[in-house]
Every structure is written in structure tokens, then in C-alpha cells.
Design a protein with these regions (language model features):
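Polytopic transmembrane helical bundles with strong interfacial aromatic enrichment
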Residues: 1-123
Length: 123
């Protein structure tokens, strides 16, 4: 029988991603208020935090509650957090417009993460 338990690094990375979602949410609300308001990017930051935290929860589910750890689902979800949320965070603070095309790639990665769960077989 194949061992489908998540690797230790995946559990640790999930914890770090979740913690950073909370940290960045608090930082946006309390440390970057003026910058985000000046740039008119409060909603961009809030969108990044929302998707970051939703997908941190998905990573917890993937690593702890599924009967079969899906490396592909985990990979797509993690890539989505970094590309989608990361590009929005940077866009909100620095207004780097060239990051705009990266955001949808992260969004597609999120979609693929959810769709790859269709392949997970229950035992």
C-alpha cells in the first residue's frame, strides 16, 4: 500500500503560508493604510488577503483531511498563493503594472488546484 501522508515540509509550508496571510492582513489594515489609501489600492490588498487565507485553508485540508495527499493539488494551490496573491500585494504597494499579467496565471493555478481534487480517490 502506498503511503499518501503529506511530507513534513508541506505541513510546515502550509503553516507559514497561513501565518503570513494573517500577518499581511494585519499589516495592510494597520501599517500600510496610508500607502494603500493614497494609491487607491485597499481593495486590491483585501482581495489578495482573502484569496491567500481561503487557499491557506485549502492547504490545511489537503495536508490533514484528505485520505490521499495530492501533490498536484498542493503544488497548484501554493503556486496560486505566490503568483496571484503575491502579485496583488506588490501591485497594491508599489503599483508595478507589469505584474498585472502574472495575477491571472496565479488565478488559473488556483482553478487547477480545485479541479485536481476531482482526481483524488476516496478509500
Amino acid at each position: 500500500m502506498k503511503n499518501n501522508k503529506p511530507p513534513n515540509w508541506a505541513i510546515k509550508l502550509t503553516a507559514i503560508i497561513g501565518a503570513f496571510g494573517i500577518i499581511l492582513g494585519a499589516f495592510g489594515a494597520h501599517g500600510l493604510e496610508e500607502v494603500l489609501e493614497k494609491n487607491g489600492n485597499e481593495s486590491v490588498w483585501k482581495t489578495a488577503v482573502f484569496y491567500h487565507l481561503i487557499h491557506a485553508v485549502l492547504l490545511v485540508v489537503i495536508t490533514h483531511n484528505l485520505r490521499a495527499f495530492s501533490k498536484l493539488t498542493y503544488l497548484f494551490c501554493t503556486i496560486g498563493v505566490f503568483l496571484f496573491c503575491g502579485s496583488l500585494y506588490l501591485l497594491a504597494i508599489f503599483e508595478l503594472k507589469w505584474l498585472g499579467p502574472i495575477t491571472p496565471i496565479g488565478g488559473v493555478s488556483f482553478i487547477l488546484a480545485w479541479l485536481t481534487m476531482l482526481k483524488i480517490k476516496s478509500t
